[in-house]
Structures are given as structure tokens and as C-alpha cells.
């Protein structure tokens, strides 16, 4: 901080000898204050000391001392305001980094030392303990003050911040709390006037000697100017005295580091994309509001500095050049800026000349090109560019269902309802006796206390009642949703801020009567009310307001509360888009931005609608009449499956408390909502469907077995076959579910039968995905299992893929049914086709398993499957692999097969001779195919391929001759490939 500047020039009057002025000591409690102190207090806070000296030619020294004594600020609230943040510190820091808190700790630890007040100047030393291993640090602090305001500060620390450092706070609080312990002296000019020439010379020389390194150049320069007769310093009467207080013309305001404020705002705006930057700017706005509340002129000064930096934000020109709107965070900051200017200009405490100066400033700023519009969504100024008029029927409807002024009071740029409501509540607010850094924040936030303050001239009225009436009047007004994303978002935010104010008010009997009266008026308000019977389709919904009214009225008038909330459940824009009885084109996408391009906040409004419905369901627990009424309203007005599902979950959770029996009616409501969600999303693919289906089964389980069987019996309209077979039937028959239901044997079998019927129906409808789950579910019932098996056989003829058939066949083998597994494997092979070059076909392992199965069953099954293998598989390596596997052991030696041969089958005998011929033919065909487009880098692979072919050829009695003829044929046919043929000769001769 910079050292305080010299104040005003003073003459050197010959004052009386200094007398003791010990009147600063605190007076005993209950004793009247001296007239001298009463007068000095009033003068000290209203008049500059220069004005006192001009008015009275001689001011006695005791009077001077009392005026100087009382000129220092007397309240810690101002010190706190100029040394604390406007928002709570991060979690865990416990205000440790707030200068006011640190200064208070320094004061309480005895760190303040050598405090001296000379006139209007206070100085002292602050000893701050160092970090572990570091020495104690000493800081010298100087404070200048005038008319109960600190006008400048100086500290030896390097802390550069918007407000006072902890050392300034410690010294200021010491002066306020221990004023009688501070040594008090009159301004230094008064002391100098009592010295003769020798004393003055000695004083100056001692001063220069003590600080020669700092003041010697300045002292020599001043001496030269004084000795020069025509110098400027000799033309001025008197000399400056930094301890003599401010002059008459000097501004009387608290010290504010303007340069630091400008730098801080500039830096924060450049980091505007970060949450912390916006938070700190809001903190500065809060500080301005605090200053305005305390009628501190620095509020307007600080706001001017901030506005200038906002207008110099480089992003404004960029957004204007690109034709893009400003970000949401930035728009909110500009809104706050505008709201503060409204408070400043309309303040009843400002002077007319101040207001005129501010208006001139605002007009100049408004003419700047970069100054953003208050509503940036209206960009067409020319009459020819205006949007065309809406269709006549819509205009007629709008005229009959909406008030003349379509611009609502809530969400208006000037926020008339919010300002009026806050002003009325401020008049009723009880003052806090204790000093609090953050009265509106923190985990231990106390509820604000309000009291009824009567309105003068209006018997029976109070400002608190008026505040409630005004707020409900604005919130319940029917108003069209404005154009543009930000304007719509502002409507929502203003509404929430207004309701937050109302929630702070504790409702007594008087306010409850007002609430009931206003609720009745809103229900009967016609087109002027958002709760009226007829709404314009683009009216702002009343969900948030209705939720507050419902909660407030419920203990006092439940019938009125439900009627109001049910009326507010409407969302007119969706009622128009989805007429009753018509199917929704896309149930999951109720927003449908292409159909509602202007309703940017529709998702938020639907969420608020859901919250209102959830509140009503929770409140209606135990009341079947209202529960079914609320359910009907939900089914009629809520069109989002995701929100309906959330409502169903909330209702189920509320209906099943941990330490109480479940509410069966509310559980039924939850199930009904879940069923509606299932029907709405049946034909829509969404990642949440599986979660929804599982939850529905668990909800039905909570109700009982009949509910579970009902959803199984009506699965066609609720689930896909896969969901029904793999989730509903399986989950509904798990051990945990059966234990939960606590069924006897007959009821358990009834549930199992229902699940098996469901599984068979799903298998018939979608055998490809449901056949195996159906077989698994029907394992314990022979007839059902046979029916499921027959469904698989029928589906195989109808196009069931080989992969699914192989899967079911493996399942059959695992179940100990090898013949059925063999049957399904042959059906799968009949559909399979593996080309000569598909060595890594996905079905290779399945084919080898099928061959192994047939070999284990016996020669008859092996003979039957060979033609299928030859017809389906044309890959030579696969055929030779199968052939070798079958020749390793005798058929029928498997664990389930009969021993029908004493030795392995020969490859040259039936039934394997056909397979051998097929393998040889496949090798010959594949070789010719590969040689057609072979490249030199594949010669090595081809030679290896011929090596495997020779092994297969040699399985035949005349295999050696066949292979030699095959090679000769290759050499003659492909004699142009000399290098390849050379490699063939080297390997095979």
C-alpha cells in the first residue's frame, strides 16, 4: 500500500501549552456523557477540522483533542466490510485467510505494539509470528482518517489486495477497542508551533540524522527551495501537515485502492471461463451492495471502476464481430451490474448532482459499440426485418387467455417484483446484534427473523403482509415465456430467487390467512392468473410457485393446497403438441427441439413439474383419494418417460420405509407409473430400459405375487421378448424373489408356471434370442421343456441361424441329452457353409465339437454326419483336421456312446473314404485358386500348404501316386512361375 499523501497546508499559530486531555477514558456505565464529548462526536463525524479552524479563530486544546479523538471510526462493521470477502471461504479454511479474521487473531494475541495517534494519523507496529523455523516479522502500519472514515493506509507487508490487510485491521480494532490506551497527540504542526528557532533546528537535524538515508535528498531539495526567495514554496502560506486531517474541499470517503480494483476486475474477466473468477466477481458485487446498504459513497465509486473494466473486456468486441451471443456466466454478471446501477441511480440518499453525473456516465457508456444490449436476442431493428405476424387463431387465443402486457413482472430486466419485495422485507428484518462476516452463508446459516411492521395510515396492514402479497402477485401472473435462451433462463432464476426470499419468512397465522386469500384469488383469477382455468399455450408454467404454495398451505388447508397444485401441473406447450389420445411420435424425447425452437428451458420446466408431482405424491401418502387424483394428473400432464420413471422410483421409496409397513396404495401408484413408462418406451431403444425393467419387477415383488404374475401375463404390451425372457421371468423366479414373497408350495408352482408360459411365448415370438432362456427356465418341467425343444426344432426350419443352433446343441449336451444335441448340430451344419479360404471361420470350433459329438455317439451317427460335413465345408485344412480326429480312435468310445468297433476306422474305408476324397479334392481346388493370384512373398506359405496336402494325400492307399500326378500337373500348368516351381522341386522332388 502506498504511504498516505500529505493532507492540507496549515499555518503555524502560537498554541497554548499542552495540557492533559484524559477525557478519552471510558466513562462509567450509567453516567451521562459530557457535553464536550457529545459535541465533539457530532463535529468529528460531520465537519472537516479545517472548517472548525476557519469557523472559530481559537479552538481550546482540550476541544481539539476530543475532536481528534472522536474522528476515528467507532464501529467495527465498517472495518469488517473493508477487510472481508463477499463470499464464504473454501471448505476447511474456516475464514483463516480472511484479513478481518487474521487481524482479529493478531489483536487477541497481543501483536499490536507502540500505538501512537498524532492528530488524524494513527501508527503502530504489528508483530506477526513466523512460520516454523522462521523469525518473527515486524510490520509498521500507518492510518490516516477523517470524519470517522479511514482515508488512507500504509503497511510494510507486500500484500496487494482490494481491501485492508490483516495488520491494518489489527491496528484499527486496537484503536476502537482500547482507545483509552492509545497515546494521543495534537497534529504535529501544533507541536512545532510551540518550539523556538533552536528547538526547530535541533528537531530537523535529529530527524535527518535518524533517517538520513531516506530523507537527506528530500531535505536538501526543500532547503534549497526555501532559501530561494522566488520559489513556489515561499509563495504559499503555511506548510503541509499529514496529521492535520482533510481540507474542506477534500472528498470524505473511505480509502479504496482504485488501481487495484481495476487490475483485479481486468484479470478476473480475462479468466472468465473459470468458476472461481465468476465467484470472485460476484463477491465484489456483493461488496458493492453492502456499501450501498450502509450508504457508503464508495459503492458507486467501485461500481464505476468495475463497469469501465467490463466495457474494456476484449471478448465484447470479439462476440460482436462474430455475431455470437455472450456466455451465460458473462450475461449473468452483466445483469448483476445493471441491477446495481438501478440501485445506485434510484437511491433516495444520493444528491441530485451525483445522480446527474451517473446518468451522464451511463449515457456515454450506452453509446459505445461494444456495450451489450440488455436483451441480446432482438437483433432486427428495421421494420422490414421484423418477424411476420402469427396466425390469426393464435392471436385470438392469446388475446383471450393472456393479459395485455405479455412482458411479465418476474423476469423483467428491472426486476420490479423482486426489488419491491426485498424493500418491504428489509423494513421488517430484525437487526442482528453480533457482527457476522457472512450473514447469508455457511452450514450454520440461521433463518432470517422478520417481524410485522405496521404501515403508517393503513390500519391492519404490515410491510410483511405486503411483501407476501406482492411476491405472490408477481409469481402467479400469467405471462408469456420471452424470446431467447438467456431471457428464459432469467425468468426461472428470478422466480427461484423470489421464492427463496419467501421461504425465509416464517408463516404465522396472519400470513397463513393472506396465503389462503391469495391462493383463492389465483385460482379464480381468469386470464390474469397463471393458475386460471384457461392458459395460453406459451404461458410460463407455475410449477415452482405451486410447490411453495402447496407446502405452505398443506398443514392449514389441504383441500386448497391440492386444488392449487393440481391446477399448476399443466404444461400448455406439451398439451398442444401431444393432444390427448394421440400417440407420441418420440416418447423419450419430449423436448423435441425441432418442434419447440423457442423453448430452450423446456427440460428444466419439465423437471420442476416432476418435483411438484413428487411433492404431492409424498404428501398424499396414506390418502387413497388424493393419491389417485394426483396419479391421474401425472398421467395426463407429464410426457417424459425418464421423469415418470423417476416419479415411480420416488413413490416406491416413499411407500417402503425401513422401519414401518409399506403403503400398498402408494406402491400401486408407483407400479402404475412404471407400467406407463414401459408402454411408452416399448418401441424405443434406450440404455435405461434394462434398469427400468428390473425396477418394475422389484416393485411388483414388493406388492405381491399377483402383481408379479400380472406383468408376466401381460408382457406383450410392456416388454420385448428378450426383456421378458431374460429379465422378467428370470428375476421373478430367483431364490431371493421367492424368499421375499414367502409363498407356499402351490403359489410358488403357480408363479413358476406363469414364468414358463411367458418363456415359451417369448421363444415362439423371438426364438433366435429367447430359445435358450426358455429351455433354461423349463428345465424342471418335462412337458414345458419338450415344448421349448420343439419350438427350437420348428424355428430351425424357419431360419434360426447356425450359431444359435450350435449354442442350444451345446446346452443339450451339457444337460446330458447327446442325441438331441446331435440332432440340433446336424440342423446347424445343414445351414452352414465354409469356403476354401475361411480357415478362421467363427463356426470352426462348433464344427469340430459337432464332429467330436457324432464320433462319440457311434458309427451310425458318424456316417450320417459325413455327407453334411462334405456339403457344408470346403476348407481343405478343416476337412483334413476332422479326418485325422476321426481316425485316432474307434467311434462310439465316448462316455455316452456304445462300443461298436474294436479298432479305429481307416481313412480309406467307408464312411471316411468319402471325407478323404473331399479333402483331397479341396486341396487340389484350393491350390489352383491360390496359384491364380499368388505373389512371391507368399511362396513360402504355399510350400507349407503343399506339405499339409501331401500328408492328407498319403492317407489313401495310392496317395503317393496321386500327389506326384498332382505336382506334375502344377509344374505343367504353372511353368511360368519358375521360382515357385523350383521351390516345389527342391521340397518334393
UniProtKB/Swiss-Prot annotation:
Keywords: Metal-binding, Zinc, Zinc-finger. Coiled coil: none annotated. Residues 1-32 are annotated as: Disordered. PROSITE patterns: ZF_SWIM. A zinc finger (SWIM-type) spans 139-176. GO terms for cellular component: Cul2-RING ubiquitin ligase complex. InterPro entries: Znf_SWIM, ZSWIM4-8_C. GO terms for molecular function: zinc ion binding. The keyword Zinc applies. Pfam families: ZSWIM4-8_C. PANTHER family: ZINC FINGER SWIM DOMAIN CONTAINING PROTEIN 4, 5, 6, ZINC FINGER SWIM DOMAIN-CONTAINING PROTEIN 4. This is Zinc finger SWIM domain-containing protein 4. The gene is ZSWIM4.
Amino acid at each position: 500500500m502506498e504511504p498516505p499523501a500529505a493532507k492540507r497546508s496549515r499555518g503555524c499559530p502560537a498554541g497554548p501549552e499542552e495540557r492533559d486531555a484524559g477525557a478519552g477514558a471510558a466513562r462509567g456505565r450509567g453516567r451521562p456523557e459530557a457535553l464536550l464529548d457529545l459535541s465533539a462526536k457530532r463535529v468529528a463525524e460531520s465537519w472537516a477540522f479545517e472548517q472548525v479552524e476557519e469557523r472559530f479563530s481559537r479552538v481550546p486544546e482540550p476541544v481539539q483533542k476530543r475532536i481528534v479523538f472522536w474522528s476515528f471510526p467507532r464501529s467495527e462493521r465498517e472495518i469488517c466490510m473493508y477487510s472481508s470477502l463477499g463470499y464464504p471461504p473454501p471448505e476447511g479454511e474456516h475464514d483463516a485467510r480472511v484479513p478481518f479474521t487474521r487481524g482479529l487473531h493478531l489483536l487477541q494475541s497481543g501483536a499490536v505494539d507502540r500505538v501512537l495517534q498524532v492528530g488524524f494519523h494513527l501508527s503502530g507496529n504489528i508483530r506477526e509470528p513466523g512460520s516454523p523455523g522462521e523469525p518473527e516479522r515486524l510490520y509498521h502500519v500507518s492510518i490516516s482518517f477523517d470524519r470517522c472514515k479511514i482515508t488512507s493506509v500504509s503497511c510494510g507487508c507486500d500484500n496487494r489486495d482490494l481491501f485492508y490487510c490483516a495488520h491494518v485491521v489489527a491496528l484499527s480494532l486496537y484503536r476502537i477497542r482500547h482507545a483509552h490506551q492509545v497515546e494521543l497527540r495534537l497534529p504535529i504542526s501544533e507541536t512545532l508551533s510551540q518550539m523556538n528557532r533552536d528547538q526547530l533546528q535541533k528537531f530537523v537535524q535529529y530527524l535527518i540524522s535518524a533517517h538520513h538515508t531516506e530523507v537527506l535528498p528530500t531535505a536538501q531539495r526543500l532547503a534549497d527551495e526555501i532559501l530561494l526567495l522566488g520559489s513556489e514554496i515561499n509563495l504559499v502560506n503555511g506548510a503541509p501537515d499529514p496529521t492535520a486531517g482533510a481540507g474542506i474541499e477534500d472528498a470524505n470517503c473511505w480509502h479504496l485502492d482504485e488501481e487495484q480494483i481495476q487490475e483485479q476486475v481486468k484479470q478476473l474477466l480475462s479468466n472468465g471461463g473459470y468458476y472461481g473468477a465468476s465467484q470472485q466477481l460476484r463477491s465484489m458485487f456483493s461488496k458493492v451492495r453492502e456499501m450501498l446498504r450502509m450508504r457508503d459513497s464508495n459503492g458507486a465509486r467501485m461500481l464505476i471502476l468495475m463497469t469501465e473494466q467490463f466495457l474494456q473486456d476484449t471478448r465484447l468486441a470479439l462476440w460482436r464481430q462474430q455475431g455470437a451471443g455472450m456466455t451465460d456466466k458473462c450475461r449473468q454478471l452483466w445483469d448483476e451490474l445493471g441491477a446495481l446501477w438501478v440501485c445506485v441511480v434510484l437511491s433516495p440518499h444520493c444528491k441530485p448532482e451525483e445522480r446527474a453525473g451517473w446518468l451522464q456516465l451511463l449515457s456515454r457508456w450506452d453509446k459505445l459499440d461494444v456495450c451489450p444490449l440488455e436483451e441480446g436476442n432482438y437483433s432486427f431493428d428495421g421494420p422490414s426485418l421484423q418477424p411476420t405476424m402469427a396466425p390469426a387463431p393464435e392471436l385470438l387465443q392469446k388475446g383471450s387467455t393472456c393479459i395485455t402486457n405479455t412482458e411479465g413482472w418476474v423476469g423483467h430486466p428491472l426486476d420490479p417484483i423482486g426489488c419491491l419485495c426485498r424493500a418491504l422485507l428489509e423494513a421488517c428484518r430484525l437487526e442482528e446484534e453480533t457482527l457476522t462476516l457472512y450473514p447469508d452463508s455457511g452450514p450454520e446459516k440461521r433463518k432470517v427473523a422478520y417481524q410485522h411492521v405496521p404501515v403508517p395510515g393503513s390500519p391492519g396492514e404490515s410491510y410483511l403482509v405486503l411483501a407476501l402479497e406482492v411476491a405472490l402477485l408477481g409469481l402467479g401472473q400469467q405471462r408469456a415465456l420471452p424470446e431467447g435462451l438467456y431471457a428464459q433462463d432469467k425468468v426461472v432464476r428470478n422466480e427461484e430467487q423470489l421464492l427463496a426470499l419467501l421461504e425465509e419468512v416464517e408463516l404465522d397465522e396472519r400470513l397463513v390467512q393472506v396465503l389462503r386469500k391469495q391462493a383463492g384469488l389465483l385460482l379464480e383469477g381468469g386470464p390474469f392468473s397463471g393458475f386460471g382455468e384457461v392458459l395460453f399455450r406459451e404461458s410460463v408454467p407455475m410449477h415452482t410457485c405451486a410447490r411453495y404454495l402447496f407446502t405452505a398451505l398443506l398443514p392449514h388447508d389441504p383441500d386448497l393446497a391440492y386444488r392449487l397444485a393440481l391446477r399448476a401441473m399443466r404444461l400448455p406447450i406439451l398439451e398442444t403438441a401431444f393432444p390427448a389420445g394421440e400417440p407420441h411420435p418420440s416418447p423419450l424425447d419430449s423436448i423435441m427441439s425441432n418442434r419447440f425452437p423457442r423453448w430452450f428451458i423446456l427440460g428444466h420446466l419439465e423437471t420442476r413439474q416432476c418435483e411438484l408431482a413428487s411433492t404431492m405424491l409424498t404428501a398424499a401418502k396414506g390418502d387413497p383419494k388424493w393419491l389417485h387424483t394426483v396419479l391421474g394428473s401425472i398421467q395426463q400432464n407429464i410426457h417424459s418417460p425418464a421423469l415418470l420413471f423417476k416419479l415411480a422410483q420416488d413413490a416406491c421409496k416413499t411407500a417402503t420405509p425401513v422401519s414401518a409397513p409399506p403403503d400398498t396404495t402408494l406402491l400401486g401408484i408407483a407400479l402404475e407409473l412404471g407400467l406407463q413408462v414401459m408402454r411408452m418406451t416399448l418401441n424405443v431403444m434406450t440404455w435405461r430400459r434394462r434398469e427400468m425393467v428390473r425396477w418394475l419387477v422389484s416393485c411388483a415383488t414388493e406388492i405381491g405375487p399377483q402383481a408379479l404374475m400380472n406383468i408376466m401375463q401381460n408382457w406383450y404390451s410392456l416388454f420385448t421378448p428378450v426383456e421378458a425372457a431374460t429379465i422378467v421371468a428370470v428375476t421373478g423366479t430367483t431364490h431371493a424373489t421367492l424368499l421375499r414373497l414367502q409363498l407356499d408350495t402351490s403359489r410358488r408352482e403357480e408363479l413358476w408356471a406363469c414364468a414358463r408360459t411367458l418363456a415359451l411365448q417369448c421363444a415362439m415370438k423371438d426364438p433366435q434370442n429367447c430359445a435358450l432362456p426358455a429351455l433354461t427356465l423349463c428345465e424342471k418341467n418335462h412337458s414345458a421343456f419338450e415344448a421349448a425343444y420343439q419350438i427350437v426344432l420348428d424355428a430351425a426350419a424357419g431360419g434360426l441361424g447356425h450359431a444359435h443352433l450350435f449354442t442350444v446343441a451345446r446346452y443339450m449336451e451339457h444337460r446330458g441329452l447327446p442325441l438331441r444335441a446331435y440332432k440340433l448340430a446336424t440342423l446347424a451344419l445343414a445351414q452352414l457353409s465354409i469356403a476354401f479360404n475361411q480357415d478362421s471361420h467363427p463356426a470352426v470350433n462348433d464344427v469340430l465339437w459337432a464332429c467330436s459329438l457324432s464320433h462319440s455317439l457311434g458309427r451310425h451317427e458318424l456316417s450320417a454326419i459325413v455327407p453334411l460335413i462334405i456339403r457344408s465345408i470346403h476348407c481343405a485344412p478343416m476337412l483334413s483336421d476332422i479326418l485325422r480326429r476321426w481316425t485316432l480312435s474307434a467311434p462310439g468310445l465316448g462316455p455316452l456312446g456304445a462300443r461298436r468297433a474294436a479298432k479305429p476306422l481307416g481313412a480309406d474305408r467307408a464312411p471316411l473314404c468319402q471325407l478323404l476324397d473331399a479333402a483331397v479334392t479341396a486341396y487340389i481346388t484350393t491350390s489352383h485358386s491360390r496359384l491364380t493370384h499368388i505373389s512371391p512373398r507368399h511362396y513360402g506359405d504355399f510350400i507349407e500348404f503343399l506339405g499339409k496336402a501331401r500328408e492328407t494325400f498319403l492317407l489313401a492307399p495310392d496317395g503317393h501316386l496321386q500327389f506326384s500326378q498332382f505336382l506334375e500337373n502344377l509344374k505343367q500348368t504353372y511353368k511360368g512361375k519358375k521360382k515357385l516351381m523350383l521351390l516345389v522341386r527342391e521340397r518334393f522332388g
